[in-house]
């Protein structure tokens, strides 16, 4: 048992490999809260949120009470103002839910991780002792996203443009891991991070963010 329990965020731009990194952490039996999943659950199930989204983006935002992902994505990422609007609706609710889930997980775990692409955009960094940034070159990230069929090149570029650049994130993150290599190399970095965090928790060293 660690002297200090730790809340740790894992972030990174689209296609950086943060989800794969978190999968390796989860394989070690550490809880990983996925902010993107929470956001989708809130959008689909929170009546007040749905009403705000429909008011801003129209009735087509939902079909048969289900999220119209294609319509909303086109609406949101076609205009930076719409990104700000949807974030202002979702981020406060996501932050509350993440806080709740972290507290629940810390009852039985020394370290809880949260995977979230928009840690800095949502101003969530002060919720955590440490923020971990996973980075990769823009061309590498683009190839990954297109290869797995998630987005077209144009869709990738639109979403990438609406995220804070890695250069700025690197200045604010506590740990930065490059992910331009193999999956095995990324796994080794995840293992290394866990070892470091256990050491920090054992010595009760907190980040300057929460001291």
Name every feature range the model reports, one short phrase each.
Residues 97-98, 105, 126-127, 147-196:
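Small-molecule kinase domains that catalyze NTP-dependent phosphoryl transfer to phosphate-bearing small molecules
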Residues 7, 32, 111, 125, ...:
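Hydrophobic "anchor" residues on beta-strands that sit immediately upstream
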Residues 50-54, 138-143, 153, 157:
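An amphipathic alpha-helix signature
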Residues 20-23, 31-44, 59, 77, ...:
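N-terminal polybasic phosphate/anion-binding patch
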Residues 199-211:
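A short, charged, Gly/Pro-tolerant segment at domain boundaries
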Residues 99-107, 111-147:
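ATP-dependent NMP and nucleoside kinases share a basic, alpha-helical "lid"
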Residues 1-37:
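Walker A (P-loop) phosphate-binding motif
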Residues 37-110:
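ATP-dependent small-molecule kinase phosphotransfer cores
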């Amino acid at each position: 048992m660690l002297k200090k329990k730790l809340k740790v965020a894992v972030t990174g731009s689209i296609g950086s490999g943060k989800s794969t990194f978190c999968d390796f952490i989860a394989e070690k039996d550490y809880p990983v809260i996925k902010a993107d999943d929470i956001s989708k659950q809130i959008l689909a199930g929170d009546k007040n949120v749905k009403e705000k989204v429909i008011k801003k983006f129209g009735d087509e935002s939902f079909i048969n009470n289900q999220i119209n992902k294609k319509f909303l994505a086109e609406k949101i990422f076609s205009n930076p103002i719409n990104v700000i609007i949807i974030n202002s609706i979702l981020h406060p609710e996501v932050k509350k839910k993440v806080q709740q889930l972290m507290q629940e997980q810390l009852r039985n775990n020394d370290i809880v991780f949260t995977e979230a692409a928009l840690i800095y955009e949502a101003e969530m960094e002060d919720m955590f002792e440490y923020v971990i940034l996973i980075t990769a070159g823009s061309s590498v990230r683009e190839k990954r996203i297109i290869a797995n069929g998630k987005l077209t090149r144009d869709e990738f570029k639109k979403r990438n443009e609406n995220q804070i650049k890695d250069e700025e994130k690197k200045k604010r993150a506590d740990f930065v891991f490059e992910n331009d290599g193999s999956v095995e190399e990324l796994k080794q970095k995840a293992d290394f991070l866990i070892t470091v965090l256990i050491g920090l928790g054992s010595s009760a060293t907190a980040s300057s963010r929460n001291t």
